[in-house]
């Protein structure tokens, strides 16, 4: 960690352009920092490969600068995620004594959905997150990703990413960290 303006971006690009010399993925917390990485490549002689600098996840290049969200966006729903989330929620209802068995827990959820859709949706969202977190903690973080994030990762793998630069990584939450560990393994 160094103060703003101390040259971290330029140092990172130097390591990539002059030492590593492999396709790189730069991940940043926002689009302003993402664009900064691409813009600073103009300070280096890329031997005519300047056109291969990208900020578009659909067109990765020798250096692809993206936001963390482009490769870590979680899935929001889907039958399989919802099924597991509802099962987890039902187990909690039984543990807390709000339902006697699995069938009555499912009936409780259905009644809530019919009578208070907004609260039901809020609770389901909470249990989806718990399921995603549990999968990520147990080595299945890639399963938790939205289809667009998975597609972005596949395209990045095809260009042969040899270096991942994490800008502002000290701000990363556990979700991103777990996923990025698996992303590195996926690229290897």
Segments and roles (model prediction):
Residues 1-188:
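N-terminal helicase ATP-binding lobe
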